[in-house]
Amino acid sequence: MMGDRNFRTVITSAIESVSKQLDYKIDTENIDKIHLSEVTKCLRRSYFDRTDPIESEIAHFSDLVGGMFRQLEYGSAPAEYDLKNMKLEGQADMIADDVVMIFRSVSEFPEDPHAKDILYLNGCLWIYGETNGIIVYINGDGKEASFSLTKNKKMFEEVIRRVRVLKDLVKEKKPPILEPSTECSTCQYYERCFSKKKRNEKDLIAQIIGQRV
């Protein structure tokens, strides 16, 4: 009977299928090709995704909404930027009239665009050889707020630096330094970054209590 089915499993499976279909396709075995999304978010997270991945239990619809737009008429194809000994790959969500666009879903509209979205869009501008771009935020009611961006060389140089850092650290098997953010609490690698510190604090408390006793 339908009532006997584990609907949570069905829903989870459906979400995972949508995620795999719409998310960026990244070859984690190829360290000579780094995806733009890897270096515009936490490098430590990207490092673990490549070296010792854990499946995230949370679907990031903020990113997946862009994948939906990539399926439309003006959806863009992946492109690469040559860095001589390696390549930076990126994919905008749409390109129309030479304007590069990315879409993100949000619960509340930000006063300013998120830093990682600015870096991602700016990277796309360089990869596609365009000058102007737009970040479009969409809320649960279907309303939108947009921010325009002009190609910036200094920001792109920072992205390139992070590309080389990620490649070197993956090759050397050395985790990047911590980059604390509001996303840490929901990250599947949280315990790899913070559990040791927590254990040390607990050990210290235990020692203090023991000394007092």
Predicted feature locations:
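Short, intrinsically disordered, charge-biased short linear motifs at domain edges
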Residues: 24-31, 165-182
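Metal-dependent nuclease catalytic cores that hydrolyze phosphodiester bonds in DNA/RNA
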Residues: 1-100, 107-115, 122, 206-213
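Cysteine-cluster motifs in flexible loop/terminal segments that predominantly coordinate metals
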Residues: 36-48, 173-213
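Non-membrane alpha-helical secondary structure
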Residues: 3, 7, 57, 151, ...
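Short helix-capping/linker segments at secondary-structure and domain boundaries
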Residues: 50-55, 75-76, 129-133, 195-199
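Short alpha-helical "patches" and their helix-cap loops
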Residues: 60, 135-141, 200-208
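Generic preference for well-ordered secondary structure
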Residues: 31, 53, 57, 78, ...
